[in-house]
Amino acid sequence: MLPAGSISSAYRKPHTGWQHRAVLNGGMTYNKYRTRARATTRRIRRITLGAGLLVVIAAVAAAPGFQSLASSTIHVLRSEHHDALGEALPSTVWPAQGQAAVQVGESQVQAGPNQHPAPIASVAKVMTAYLVLRDHPLGPDEDGPTITLTDADVADTDHRRGRQESVVSIAAGEQLTERQALQALLLPSANNIAAVLARWDAASVDRFVGRMNAAAQSLGMTHTRYTDPSGYDDPTVSTAADQVLLVDRAMRLPVFASIVATSSVTLPVAGTVRNTDGLLGHNGFVGVKTGSTDAAGGCFAFRAIRWIGGKHTTIAGVVLGQPGHDLVAAGLAAADAMVDRIASPARARAMPVLQP
């Protein structure tokens, strides 16, 4: 696993600075493009239509065949408009293995191949945090109510530690604020705190899991099934496309966005804990959540902000099932490479492309 705030040299990209000269595809400068377009417009304006021709056009337009053709033409124009502002991603964008999906700016979610329900590991904690904040909203400067940890919580933590799960140290009688519990959940990815939050929110883990599944259905996550609040259980499955829908919704919550953008925090008993997101602060990445198990592979739900088409553009995405010796690093590397390919200036068709 990468240390917090670091990233292996295998996938660290140098910062090249902002680019400044507008060039369209094919090497035509933006100014030359505008000059040619204006000349074409002037020629069109000189064309006049006779009254007889207008009558013919009106008659043809009324014909059923023409109406069908017009409908098809409108569809093509809309497709081209969408293509220019948020074009369909080429197959080279997606990771070679596993599955992935992204949403670029305000466009629709686009999914790569192999979209089938699969284990998502700790990416499931995004839903856990989303539900807790939905049920117990926090203001930007609020820490929220306190949660007192019990002997049962300590016993559960010891059991999970024995299974090599990701946990943070706790003590009976320790008090965590809601914000601190969410930080423990999302930064070091503490499975024991996922269970604590589930019981605090819904009185039992099973009831909380039921709420997770109800929320998934309400968000249109039709290929998602949660069986635990941490994602450690393999039967917790989803698709990358489903999880992108959740990332978008969760990042609308300022407290969630603030927590996942934090590199480390200090907890009462655990001390300093660090974010497992080694891409945080690099190449425009601003969060969200890593995950890894043998069954799930390397997983990463993320948001990045990159310079595309002459403006800062948000890229929200998820990669699942990435193979490698270090599964967390594999998920991070796949996301980093995918965002780089999406943000490549060569892909900004029909827009001024910024180049040095």
Model-found features: residue ranges?
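Alpha-helical scaffold elements that line and support the substrate/ligand-binding pocket
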Residues: K125-T128, A181, L185-A202, D206-F208, ...
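Terminal targeting segments of Actinobacterial cell-envelope proteins
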Residues: Y11-I47, A350-V353
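Active-site SXXK
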Residues: I120-I147, Q243
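Short, well-structured active-site flanking segments
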Residues: R134-D153, P254-T262
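Short glycine/serine- and small hydrophobic-enriched flexible loop segments
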Residues: Y130-L138, R199-A202, D248-R249, D340
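Intrinsically disordered, low-complexity segments enriched in serine/proline and basic residues
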Residues: M1-A4, W18
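Conserved catalytic neighborhood of penicillin-recognizing serine enzymes
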Residues: A155-A194, T272-V288, S292, W307
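Penicillin-recognizing serine hydrolase domain
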Residues: T29, T41-V109, H116, S204-P356
